[in-house]
């Protein structure tokens, strides 16, 4: 399954129902929820972008899977790579590598961290999307 492309649902609630997510597990930060927390967070960000009319939204990875971008959008004729992190641990090797090769790009990251501009990367808290 490592070579599989991500598949997203129309709605985060439907996704939670399909994987039989117990709301209590989400609220108490149970280890069971960790298995698909990243996918649910990506689903949330995608759903919010779609509701704001962002289109098209792409996913990108290389053949050897060394570079994977959760989302890529176009804004004002510029490519904008987007990384989504479910926690405050925001190490993103793919995004760092891309920005090293293409310093003219400005990337966005959505995570549990507060708003912060770090060179050509802007972190937005998940609640702000």
Q: What positions do the PLM features span?
A:
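Short, loop-centered acidic/histidine patches that primarily coordinate divalent metals
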Residues: 62, 72-76, 84-87, 110-113
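Short flexible/disordered coil segments
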Residues: 43-56, 115-129
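Accessory nucleic acid-recognition modules appended to NTPase machines
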Residues: 1-68, 73-76
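Structural motif
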Residues: 78-80, 106
């Amino acid at each position: 399954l490592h070579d599989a492309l991500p598949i997203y649902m129309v709605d985060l609630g439907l996704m939670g129902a399909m994987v039989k997510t117990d709301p209590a597990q989400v609220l108490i930060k149970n280890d069971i929820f960790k298995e698909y927390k990243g996918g649910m967070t990506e689903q949330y960000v995608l759903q919010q972008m779609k509701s704001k009319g962002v289109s098209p939204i792409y996913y990108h990875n290389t053949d050897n899977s060394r570079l994977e971008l959760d989302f890529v959008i176009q804004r004002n004729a510029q490519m904008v790579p987007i990384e989504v992190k479910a926690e405050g641990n925001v190490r993103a090797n793919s995004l760092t590598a891309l920005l090293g090769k293409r310093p003219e790009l400005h990337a966005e990251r959505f995570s549990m961290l507060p708003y912060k501009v770090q060179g050509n990367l802007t972190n937005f808290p998940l609640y702000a999307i």
